[in-house]
Amino acid sequence: MLIPSKLSRPVRLDHTVVRERLLAKLSGANNFRLALITSPAGYGKTTLISQWAAGKNDIGWYSLDEGDNQQERFASYLIAAVQQATNGHCAICETMAQKRQYASLTSLFAQLFIELAEWHSPLYLVIDDYHLITNPVIHESMRFFIRHQPENLTLVVLSRNLPQLGIANLRVRDQLLEIGSQQLAFTHQEAKQFFDCRLSSPIEAAESSRICDDVSGWATALQLIALSARQNTHSAHKSARRLAGINASHLSDYLVDEVLDNVDLATRHFLLKSAILRSMNDALITRVTGEENGQMRLEEIERQGLFLQRMDDTGEWFCYHPLFGNFLRQRCQWELAAELPEIHRAAAESWMAQGFPSEAIHHALAAGDALMLRDILLNHAWSLFNHSELSLLEESLKALPWDSLLENPQLVLLQAWLMQSQHRYGEVNTLLARAEHEIKDIREDTMHAEFNALRAQVAINDGNPDEAERLAKLALEELPPGWFYSRIVATSVLGEVLHCKGELTRSLALMQQTEQMARQHDVWHYALWSLIQQSEILFAQGFLQTAWETQEKAFQLINEQHLEQLPMHEFLVRIRAQLLWAWARLDEAEASARRGIEVLSSYQPQQQLQCLAMLIQCSLARGDLDNARSQLNRLENLLGNGKYHSDWISNANKVRVIYWQMTGDKAAAANWLRHTAKPEFANNHFLQGQWRNIARAQILLGEFEPAEIVLEELNENARSLRLMSDLNRNLLLLNQLYWQAGRKSDAQRVLLDALKLANRTGFISHFVIEGEAMAQQLRQLIQLNTLPELEQHRAQRILREINQHHRHKFAHFDENFVERLLNHPEVPELIRTSPLTQREWQVLGLIYSGYSNEQIAGELEVAATTIKTHIRNLYQKLGVAHRQDAVQHAQQLLKMMGYGV
């Protein structure tokens, strides 16, 4: 729960001086990106902005405290303040902030600005006490916020120092409105108004001016002088002389003498006790101070001018002026040291009664009360964990003695899940092993099953599927039906293990079961994970259309539950890119891969390896080797600067080997082949991919026999495990092996099998990347006119893609080629005496590439009748009567010029 007072603008009090000159300057705040109010404590920053904000509706107010250095807490309150200003306009961001479903503050802010694009009225967001922020991530995120905020939004920041928000840049671009301590200092006229409101007997203008000069217009000093004068301890001028030259850091002695020593003992204790509360209401005050009628007491303190301010319009919440509050807390530690733990305990109990466990934990920690802290965690820790209050939980668990954790194994489990969420896998197992060793009878307890479920998750994450399977099975055997979270975890792990083993049908069933349980209990990240796994399994089985539909369900879940910022979102858009690539929808595949990189923008660059490999695949399918080389340089740099799972390395190696094949770089392939991992098995699509990389490198090096052994074994495994997409890929590579080895009939046989299987998988680009060798074979099959209709259609589509992206259309028939051809000693006399025009050479190249008359007309952007004329002329000049004769003639010319066709 969010504390309401942190989102409430301070109430404009009676008897305050209206700062007309400063309000006039602030009236143009909507013309600036940032309004920055800076000064030391006590110059009236908050009072000024509360005056300016009075009557404005489109304004959100966020009062910071030290706890707001936690990124998740900062995000929750900031978005809540925007919601306050827009009357709930940014619902998606609100849900993302509440559920912590964002990758970083900057990505959350980016989503916020998308929603605010539809908000056209002026909008203001006030952040008070920004000097309390010390987290550099928040500073960087707020710089991003200011750079990208909508034009109709003005950020108003109040701080005791110059914040790290790119101020100089804003100042140069005239996008900064600044008010500093010199402007905030009271003028003579304002000081006179101030004393007239506060003192029963007015003082002369000259006297108030001298006082104002003595304290340099410092508002807090003026307030202290008025307080002293009312209490008749000193004359106003004497107080002013004493305060002259004093700043906020030297006020303690003065405040003791002039404030605390001049109130009765009951009020003194009330001030000291209540000061431990960062914000307070009637119930908190009554519990912490022991006084009845807490609200009445607060209002009385307010009337006495003891630096208490209202935090909301209802008058329910109060807080002390920061300067005075800090002073009181220091005095409380000195004067009430023995009582302080009990005071904090009372505060914790009251916050708990009002439903604010995070505030209660703050006071339980301050009280040093391990038992209270334990009880709060037992009741609320998992809720805080699910809301990503990880720093607070970690601090709390560290404060508990080990014996307390052992007595409450669920807290040990919580600590282990914290470690797991931070990828500290080794520490998880060490912690659980120590706990099991010391907790009596835990092996017969359900908690042991929960430990095993977590251990199973750690094992699969750490690349140990056998151990993960053993632990997941143990957990499922021992867990009661009602322990749904651990059952979801164990079921998911078991499904993933079976996926790794190639048992796809069983794995799919378990992942569907995981999805059902996760949806039932609102465990959305496991629901998303199970859908992603289902899609991968269906892709491996060759059911790409069903995989697509499963991905659509996952995208829908992301939208409904606002999971866009989870790293798993990158996984989903990446496998969508793989599917689009397979279907030769390259522009969409590239856009999806780039979206994945965007999702991971706030993570280490190494996390982008898989999406970068996907971008390279798109470049390779287009035949854009220059772009592929540029991207490969970055990929190889990432490979050399990170530790990756074997699946990631295999995917990265795939595009490297294909690039070497396309460029004929045998040296690079040979060097890689000497050092690359040779997996023991090939029983899943990850391992199949690595062995396919090895076979492709062997084919490039002319090592046909070992490559054939590899591919035949891969096919045997793929058929046995029904890895139909892998079988399709393997057949295409086997085709290239046979073709280059001169075994043309074998090459044609496996190509026909690959085309038939592609009716199921929909593969296009897997054929395209094999380039001209594939194009030649497809031309021959098309010319034979013996392919079934579906295969014929696919062959033509593949050929068009090859021609489009790899530029084989008429590359061999350009002007330079024709000139060399005509000067060749073996050129047919008919061509020498009746040379073709350049356009006719182009048409011959397109006929050779398998284009129909309509396609040639479209390619050359001329009428179909014109193409018929060109064809008739070139047939006559070549001395041929049919299209097949023209193709054979072109093939002979290419062979004569040294092209292997």
From Swiss-Prot:
GO terms for biological process: positive regulation of carbohydrate metabolic process; positive regulation of DNA-templated transcription. Activated by ATP and maltotriose, which are both required for DNA binding. Residues 853-872 bind DNA. HAMAP family: HTH_type_MalT. Positively regulates the transcription of the maltose regulon whose gene products are responsible for uptake and catabolism of malto-oligosaccharides. Specifically binds to the promoter region of its target genes, recognizing a short DNA motif called the MalT box. Monomer in solution. Oligomerizes to an active state in the presence of the positive effectors ATP and maltotriose. This is HTH-type transcriptional regulator MalT. It comes from Escherichia coli (strain ATCC 8739 / DSM 1576 / NBRC 3972 / NCIMB 8545 / WDCM 00012 / Crooks). The gene is malT.
